[in-house]
Each structure stands twice: as C-alpha cells, then as structure tokens.
UniProtKB/Swiss-Prot annotation:
One of its GO terms (biological process) is proteolysis. The gene is DDI1. Keywords: Aspartyl protease, Cytoplasm, Hydrolase, Protease, Protein transport, Transport. Residues 85-103, 368-404 have a biased composition (Low complexity). This is DNA damage-inducible protein 1. Pfam families: Asp_protease (PF09668), UBA (PF00627), ubiquitin (PF00240). The keyword 4Fe-4S does not apply. It comes from Chaetomium globosum (strain ATCC 6205 / CBS 148.51 / DSM 1962 / NBRC 6347 / NRRL 1970) (Soil fungus).
Amino acid sequence: MRITLSITNSEPQGDDQELLSLEVYPEMTIETLRSSIQAETTHHPSAQHLYHNGQLVHDNAKTLGELGVTDGDMLALHIRDMRGSTTTPAAARAAPQSAARPAARPPPAQDPEVIRLQILGDPNLRGELGRSRPDLVAALEDPQRFARLFADSLDRERRERNERQRQIQLLNADPFDIDAQARIEEIIRQERVMENLQNAMEHNPEVFGTVHMLYLEVEVNGYKVKALVDSGAQATIMSPQCAEACGIMRLVDKRFSGIARGVGTANIIGRVHSAQIKIGPLFLPCSFTVMEGKQVEMLLGLDMLKRYQASIDLAKDKLIIQGVEVPFLGPADIPVETEEAVEREPTVPGPAGTTIGQRSGAVHAPSGQSGAAPAQRPQPGATPAPAAVAATPSSQPRAPAAPSFPREHIDQLVALGASEQRAIQALEATGGNVEYAASLIFQD
C-alpha cells in the first residue's frame, strides 16, 4: 500500500512543507518507516515526529497495521532535531556559515507546533489546558498566534527562572553567610510550594472549589432564623440582635456571662435556659448562649444535635433529627453576610493569573483579579465588619418603625420589661394601641 507524508520542516535551512509518497506494507514497524524516511529525506529518525489522526506516534515497535494506517492515508511529519542541527549532511555543509547563529540564538526547548498538534489530538489535554490557559486553547486553530503566545509564556518562565538562579548565585557568593543560606532555602521552598500547587490544580482541582456552610431555616418564638449547623461548636449560640428579634432577650440569665475562648475571644452576655425552636415540623425545647462577636444569627451546636441524636447526611444534603429529614439551604439562600465574608477574604496569586482565597482555598479566574485587589486592601482594618453586619437584622426593622409611633408609647412598653424592638413589634401588631400592645407583652 502507499501512504503520503506531509513534511513540515522547522529547521532554518529546510523547506517549509513538502509531500513524500512511500510504498509501505501493514507489517512495517514505525522504526523501519523512520529509516525509510531518512533514506529519502536525510532527516535523522530522532528529528522525525510522526502524527496519525492528530496523535503523536511514540512507540517505534508498533506496526502500521496496528496503528490503523490504510492505503492512501496521509501522515503528518514534523521535523525538529532534538540533538541540534549538526548531524545532517546539509547542516554539516552549511556549518561555516551558520555556526555563529545557533550559538547566539539556540532553538527553543519545546516546539509550539508539536505542542499544538498534541493538544488538538487529545481532548482531555485540551480540557485541562482550557482551565489554566484559555487563551492558548482559543488560539489552537491559529498556528502563528499559538506560537506567539506559547513563546511569550516560555520567555516569561525563562526570565523568572533566570532571576531566581541569579539571586541564588548572588547569595552563594558567600557560602558562610547564614542569612544568605536562609534566603536560598526560602527560594527553594517557594519553588516546591508552587510546584505542589500546580500539581494540585492539575490532578485534584476539586479541592479549590468553594464549600458552602450548612444552614437550616428554623423558627424561634415565631421569628424565622437561618441557623448554621456546626457540629464542632459545644453549645447552641445566638447573637444579641437575634435574641432581641425573637423576643427572648428578657429571659437571658446574666449570671452565665463570661468570655468564650477558642480561635479568638467573644463576650458571653448570658444564657436563655429554655425556648421553643421549630426545626421542620418539629417543635423542640432548646437552650441558647447569647454571645457577641458572631457574624451568624444562630448556631446549632453539639449540645442540641446530641440531645436529639441528629445526623448530618451529606449524601442527601439533609439534617436527620428524630427521624425527620430537614433539607439544608441551597447556596442562593445562605445569608449574604457569609458570602460577603468569603468575598472579603485575602487572596494569594496562583498559576496563570488566578487568585486563591487564603481561608477557603477557592480559585478565582484571572478576570476577577482586579476585583479581588480592592477587597484585600481594607482587610487589616475590617475586623469589626462582622459585628456591623450582624447588627443589621435588628437595625433594619427598627429604623422605619421609630417615626411611626410616639416615643412616650414606646417608653411605656419598655417600662413594662419589654425590649425596645419588642415594644415596636407589639405596637405594629395592634395598630399603635398602647393598651393592646401591653397585653401582648404580658402574654409573652
């Protein structure tokens, strides 16, 4: 049978492209085919890169029949001498004229056309490259643009590598300098860290996704709250603003006040010994520790989960409590404060222009890099932001209601033992009637 080879020569003195027709047989090995090509073109087998159906042929022991080559097929042959240009007779004849040129400008270590053909023939490789370098994938159909982008990427890596080597050489000038050796160790460590990061993004990219917390919609005293389920918390916690909104702030036992110590410290106002909480269709008694400094309204801790033998089923994305399955809230229903905290977290630069969150490990695309930088600058002074965010649930309903009722009416209800917000809620429920509002407060 007869096959045709489309030869692309990347050597400076070779033809750009030529066609070669060869008489072969199915039992011919790739090694024999390379020898036949060398006899016809003088190209050494090590410089021959054969492609069949877009796939680079690596195994010289395989036959043409095993590769599926049939009569009339066309194979691509890309010529690039990995050993340099001094082995072929043509290069040897031109050595006096071109000896200075290869020395001044050595050939690149990787041929863009070979890389481009490999990516075109491997859908998996194309998908992986699309996640890290979408600009290269977009230029696959344009060889010149791909070669330009690929060369720019190699030049950038080469400059960074040369700069690191230069720093190491400067530091090695005095091998007995302890500080210089410590800096060399740090440079090498950073290289290993970036290599580990690159391997993780390539082989285990799912670890860089954003993990959403587990929230349930519950009710306390008729007030709906989005509670965070945290099996690592010892007690069930509620913010003072949420306790005000639920109308149980008056039940806080301040003898249980103190300081909570863990990752940080928080002020414990007191404890509500018993209040009714609705989880799904269940009405359950629950105790709450009222604590400041939390950016969540309520946190269901281990005391509540163990008391009712609750089970967190991540496969079903549900909380199973006393045989009842209660679904967790979806990402769109999670409180805005939590998502804003993720957006405000500081980032570190990642490969290919991406940024990675320091706490969540989430990878952000290069297009979001400009938006992440402003969020990182105010971070050192943004520590009180969670308290300000947590204060909004109580301040939002209070602001529009204050002008609606006379101040003396609110003060009368507060004198009965109700909180200011509970007094406003009672006035809203009774249309501003102080007597009816007082009776509602007494019913509490």
